[in-house]
């Protein structure tokens, strides 16, 4: 790992902590838990960035990062006596696919304004599916640790 990758990782983590902290404040998270929301958002986004850097596609990296956010959030909730969603929901929001969704919607507007074009339709479908799979991976990954760690009966 070079210095440029470490610098990019640090920058990515700091810039991901800011919206995680902002959404935690919007969701009325207790003041004592705000720093943990920001840290968890930075950890999740930074780990996703590293997975993407080392060749994993963004959908799978988002799934793994959101599972990691869920597991860490459950552990911190036991330590800080709070519900896991206090930490996890605000931490996962910086990973939502805003650019893909925006590009898909712009393609829809251009198709309605300019008429059908195969290139615009391809851009729309590609970005819409990419955004949908990322959102699905985030929601599934955030819910799986709760299903695994709070299970009362044995798995078999």
Curated annotation (Swiss-Prot):
Topology relative to the membrane: Multi-pass membrane protein
Transmembrane segments: 7-27, 54-74, 86-106, 128-148
Any one annotated GO CC term: plasma membrane
Keyword Cell inner membrane assigned: yes
Any GO BP annotation: succinate transport
A family per Pfam: ThrE_2
Subcellular compartments: Cell inner membrane
Keywords of this entry: Cell inner membrane, Cell membrane, Membrane, Transmembrane, Transmembrane helix, Transport
InterPro entries: ThrE_2, ThrE_Dicarb/AminoAcid_Exp, YjjB
Known role: Involved in succinate export with YjjP. Both proteins are required for export.
Family: Belongs to the ThrE exporter (TC 2.A.79) family.
Subunit structure: The transporter is composed of YjjB and YjjP.
Full protein name: Probable succinate transporter subunit YjjB
The species this protein was found in: Yersinia pseudotuberculosis serotype I (strain IP32953)
Gene encoding the protein: yjjB
